[in-house]
Amino acid sequence: MAKKLEITLTRSVIGRPQDQRATVEALGLKKLNSTVVKEETPAILGMINKVSHLVTVKEA
């Protein structure tokens, strides 16, 4: 069973490139401090790596 990750948007996407905004939206994050729980897959880890300066990640 894959581990679960709790991903929280902690910095705003205002002024960020469109690809970073799209990645945040694809993770399911909308507003600041919104949190989603996702399974740890290579795709999700790649998305987190791309916007690591905007999000915080914890094990759920």
From Swiss-Prot:
In terms of CDD domains, this protein maps to:
Ribosomal_L30
Q: What keywords sit in the KW lines?
A: Ribonucleoprotein, Ribosomal protein
Quote the InterPro entries the UniProt record gives. Answer: Ribo_uL30_ferredoxin-like_sf, Ribosomal_uL30_bac-type, Ribosomal_uL30_CS, Ribosomal_uL30_ferredoxin-like
Q: Which Gene3D superfamilies match?
A: Ribosomal protein L30, ferredoxin-like fold domain
The protein's GO terms of the molecular function aspect are: structural constituent of ribosome
Matching SUPFAM superfamilies: Ribosomal protein L30p/L7e
Subunit structure and binding partners: Part of the 50S ribosomal subunit.
Q: Quote the protein name from its UniProt record.
A: Large ribosomal subunit protein uL30
> Which organism's genome codes for this protein?
Bacillus cereus (strain ATCC 14579 / DSM 31 / CCUG 7414 / JCM 2152 / NBRC 15305 / NCIMB 9373 / NCTC 2599 / NRRL B-3711)
